Amino acid sequence: MLKLLLGDPNARKLKKYQPYITEINLLEEDIKVLSDEDLKGKTAEFKQRLAKGETLDDILPEAFAVVREAGRRVLGLRHFDVQMLGGVILHSGQIAEMKTGEGKTLVATLPSYLNALTGKGVHVITVNDYLARRDAEWMGQVHRFLGLSVGLIQSSMTPSERQKNYECDITYVTNSEVGFDYLRDNMATSMADVVQRPFNYCVIDEVDSILVDEARTPLIISGQVERPTEKYVQAAEIALTLQKDEHYEVDEKARNVLLTDEGFAQAEELLGVTDLFDPEDPWAHFVFNAIKAKELFLKDVNYIVRNGEVVIVDEFTGRVLPGRRWSDGLHQAIEAKEHVDIQPETQTLATITYQNLFLLYPKLGGMTGTAKTEEAEFERIYKLEVTIIPTNRIRRREDLSDLVFKKEIGKWQAIARECAEMHELGRPVLVGTTSVEKSEYLSQLLREQGIPHELLNARPENVEREAEIVAQAGRRGAVTIATNMAGRGTDIILGGNSEYMARLKLREYFMPRIVRPDDEDVFGVQRAAGLPTGHGAGQGFVPGKKVKTWKASPEIFPTQLSKEAEQLLKEAVDFAVREYGDRSLPELEAEDKVAVAAEKAPTNDPVIQKLRDAYKRIKQEYEEFTSTEHDEVVSRGGLHVIGTERHESRRIDNQLRGRAGRQGDPGSTRFFLSLEDNLLRIFGGDRVAGLMEAFNVEDDMPIESGMLTRSLEGAQRKVETYYYDIRKQVFEYDEVMNNQRRAIYAERRRVLEGQDLKEQVIKYAEKTMDEIVDYYINVDLPSEEWELDKLVDKVKEFVYLLSDMQASQLEDMGVSEIKAFLHEQVRIAYDLKEAQIDQIQPGLMRQAERFFILQRIDTLWREHLQQMDALRESVGLRGYGQKDPLIEYKSEGYELFLDMMVNIRRDVVYSLFMFQPQPQPVVQTSSEMV
């Protein structure tokens, strides 16, 4: 009712931006007639206008019109009005909700171009290396055409490559890389090692996945700590003998375990110890982790074992996360459970959450298909508004009502039947599953029924073919099973993706003849000259595969190439070999040539022109088939998406649904659920158990009930609230750390940039002297009773060069005079020390100052992080004593921080006065942290 009276706030907001769109459209004709050179010249013109005092908003309409025209010329894509609207919203620092297939990637070019004109740099953030690389190659062409530099950060890059890429006007990078680089920069020991510029503006693609789903996971850089591996092995054996419910209880919701009294007794007896918590020989931590590993972390669901290593599977995207490890000894406990080599445990050196990382940007915008469900969170934590952008074409997707089964087995059989029916009809099907294990179970059922299908999950052999499988998922009768398709980045095009197939065919012929043999490393991420890039589309890692063939599965191509097309392709590749040399390019550079050949950007390279002609011809031949098939699939109802379990968040369910019915295509979705699904079991509780009894139906008969659907949605809302509270708590606690982190990193940066740190060290020394005076002199006592001899001894402890000082020198002075006298003495002593040191090597004292300050900051900050962790755990228990844990954490954390700052000062003063370099060798100015 209120909406009717006040109007929809979203519509009001869109209306406010409408004049921009009108103005951009009016400029379109004028800009269309410009030559390529004149269009490129606009960039310099805009920069001059900004220098003369115009604002970004003043030049927005013309800048957006220029990007639209550049996109049309280079990519053959013209931004629709709704995409322009999305661009304006991103530029104004909001979140734009745009449905799947509405061209979010193209929208990002608008605000990133406009904000890059300031010269301060723009980051376009994606969820994985493959997408960052794809966007930098694809959308980067628009920016390069307009004269801006485009950078790309990939996980395998060296610091100097990172530095070069962050210097670019627009840098494509994943959220984790930008976070780890920020932390590493704040551990650098010289400015030359710092890779990032100060943050300015970023556009986050799939913003909900990064700012909401990943917000519970802090980024951590860690160093190794030695811990006895046999303790993990013993604890794993004990966990096997302990019985659930008798010796321990499992809290699935909080993902925690609690030992019962019997459990403690049993574990202590088996280990032959009297107390699991004995500080001299602690066992509790190992035993708890071993039980968690047994009960809460399941193989092929939470992790897979590959090449003798435990590799985490991301619960949101279903991708493997090689190199990431669970902390606090949990990963080691799982390694012990799986009988693989146990890697050393780690200690946190630096950490930040994504929430606080992205709050460091003065302005940020984000895009996603599903943000409205988390609108409150975006506004509370990030102060970001969500604006829904209308779709360009009317949506024709049909969301069918859920089918709920009593038993899980009945549900899977029904899904297999539905796949078979759709396959018969010739409709493509996409099934989203929540784990590797479930996807393989369904695959087995379909194999038994003889239904051809593709499987896409975290297993390495499937990862490699990811883009290839997705390109096929829209073909007639195709059945694709995928673990969490969230944010997969490759669109499912009905009838098949002819562009991608043509690109694969080009790679198949070109790569084996051009790639340098030594460069074919198993992971396909060798460093290369030229454009710094990472994983090629559809590349991955296949253990034991030493020689790459680049051959795609033959059934991926819709038809045999004509003789003419094949001839054209062979000639283009022969010409490339003549020009570049046989097997002469690094793999990534070769991937790059294929990528550019498959685009429309102007090029002067004759090899790319020839490859492009061949590519166009192949694409045209494939298109004849795919376009007929497209019409056929559309007439049969389009893509059918099956969800096999409700996710923790309605948003991820909506992302899965959003794969169907893109850009006005028809499509349908349906969720198949069972009363044994995790969500219902953990959060639906007893009500559902009661319902199960009430429904006296067969296992494979679907139940449709309003009460059940409401129960389901209630459970999902409960989960969302539960996780929102966790994220809010993570945020509130990290907020305390964040203020401390900013202070310490700012101090560190001052030291890194400071040319002359002598004054800073002297300030430290003076402050230390003041603290000694305040400690030993009680102003309430008469001066005869002051402990001047102890005071002088303490001063000499810090500054041995003042060994001649006597307490009698201070006898007739007041407190402020003593302080002034000590300040003077400490300065003289420091000059003396400097003269001694610089005799050994001129300028050595300056290097020593920087080294000691950084080393103390790093070492004490590292210890402080551990103290704060311990404090956080202990304040949690105070909640029982009617005290607010957060307030306790804030006040005690602040005390710890002040203590640390004092200790840094004192340690630096002490270390510098005690510093006795040996003649000859130069002091190494690198801290122990790196």
UniProtKB/Swiss-Prot annotation:
Sequence positions that bind ATP: 83, 101-105, 491
Catalytic EC class: translocase
Claim: Zinc is one of the keywords in the record: no
Entry GO CC: cell envelope Sec protein transport complex; cytosol; plasma membrane-derived thylakoid membrane
Source domain of life: Bacteria
Keyword field: ATP-binding, Cell inner membrane, Cell membrane, Cytoplasm, Membrane, Nucleotide-binding, Protein transport, Thylakoid, Translocase, Translocation, Transport
Gene Ontology BP term (one): protein transport by the Sec complex
Subcellular location: Cell inner membrane; Cellular thylakoid membrane; Cytoplasm
Catalytic activity: ATP + H2O + cellular proteinSide 1 = ADP + phosphate + cellular proteinSide 2
Listed Pfam families: P-loop_SecA, SecA_DEAD, SecA_PP_bind, SecA_SW
Bilayer topology annotation: Peripheral membrane protein
MF terms (GO), sorted A to Z: ATP binding; protein-exporting ATPase activity
EC number of this enzyme: 7.4.2.8
Major localization listed first in the record, in broad terms: membrane
Gene3D superfamilies associated with the record: Helical scaffold and wing domains of SecA, P-loop containing nucleotide triphosphate hydrolases, SecA, preprotein cross-linking domain
Family in the record: Belongs to the SecA family.
Function, in words: Part of the Sec protein translocase complex. Interacts with the SecYEG preprotein conducting channel. Has a central role in coupling the hydrolysis of ATP to the transfer of proteins into and across the cell membrane, serving as an ATP-driven molecular motor driving the stepwise translocation of polypeptide chains across the membrane. Probably participates in protein translocation into and across both the cytoplasmic and thylakoid membranes in cyanobacterial cells.
Subunit structure: Monomer and homodimer. Part of the essential Sec protein translocation apparatus which comprises SecA, SecYEG and auxiliary proteins SecDF. Other proteins may also be involved.
Name this protein carries in UniProt: Protein translocase subunit SecA
Gene that specifies this protein: secA
